């Protein structure tokens, strides 16, 4: 169908039937009546218009882009020491650091209570209530130095035992000395305990280990 014939048909100067017949004869892409295209072909045309792939290839890849899977992004990162790991401990090791009444010096104890020492027979009593005052009196009467530990007693009973021990020491010409808080030393008359020895007993905490 010539271009002139098409123009004539457009303005009504040629029969329309001829125009339509010639038009459909020239268009090879139109399928015959009753023909149905496969579903796969129709889906591809709808999802991917013609020329899509060509236009997509016109865009350049970003500079520095590396194709494939970037494993480096998922590798474990090495972490440096955290802040609290670098912080030095506020307290040193506890082993060997005990001082005062809680410390136990074996050498000092050996010298203080060695055989022949006035304190070699020393004993420690921890009464629970005032009813144990008799035991304290008997040990002291027999000439044994007594450490009286009243820490576990209530203040009322502890005060009564202190008064009892002080009167006992006075009656038997002994001595009654405070070693630590609620801890007292009863010494018979023939046992002379110096202030230095009492201090060493308190610092070594000897009464806590008997």
From Swiss-Prot:
Map out region (Disordered) in residue numbers. 22-72, 79-98
Establish whether keyword Ligase is in the entry: no
State the GO CC annotations. Answer: cytoplasm
Q: Where in the cell is it found?
A: Cytoplasm
| Source superkingdom | Bacteria
Q: Which GO terms describe its biological process?
A: division septum assembly; FtsZ-dependent cytokinesis
Sorted alphabetically, the keyword list is: Cell cycle, Cell division, Cytoplasm, Septation
What spans are recorded as compositionally biased (Basic and acidic residues)?
37-60, 79-88
Function statement: Cell division protein that is part of the divisome complex and is recruited early to the Z-ring. Probably stimulates Z-ring formation, perhaps through the cross-linking of FtsZ protofilaments. Its function overlaps with FtsA.
Q: How does it assemble?
A: Homodimer. Interacts with FtsZ.
**Similarity-based family:** Belongs to the SepF family.
* Name of protein: Cell division protein SepF
Q: What gene does this protein come from?
A: sepF
């Amino acid at each position: 169908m010539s271009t002139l014939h098409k123009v004539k048909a457009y303005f009504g100067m040629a029969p329309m039937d001829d125009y339509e017949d010639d038009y459909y004869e020239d268009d090879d892409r139109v399928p015959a009546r009753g023909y149905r295209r496969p579903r796969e072909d129709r889906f591809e045309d709808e999802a991917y218009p013609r020329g899509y792939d060509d236009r997509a290839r016109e865009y350049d890849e970003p500079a520095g882009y590396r194709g494939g899977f970037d494993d480096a992004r998922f590798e474990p990162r090495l972490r440096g020491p955290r802040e609290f790991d670098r912080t030095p401990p506020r307290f040193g090791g506890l082993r060997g650091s005990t001082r005062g009444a809680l410390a136990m010096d074996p050498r000092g104890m050996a010298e203080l209570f060695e055989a022949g020492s006035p304190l070699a027979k020393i004993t420690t009593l921890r009464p629970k209530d005032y009813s144990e005052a008799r035991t304290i009196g008997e040990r002291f009467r027999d000439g044994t130095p007594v450490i009286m530990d009243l820490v576990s007693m209530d203040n009322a009973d502890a005060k009564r035992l202190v008064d009892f021990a002080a009167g006992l020491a006075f009656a038997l010409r002994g001595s009654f000395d405070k070693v630590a808080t609620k801890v007292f030393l009863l010494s018979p008359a023939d046992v002379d305990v110096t202030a230095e020895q009492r201090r060493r007993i308190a610092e070594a905490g000897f009464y806590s280990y008997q």
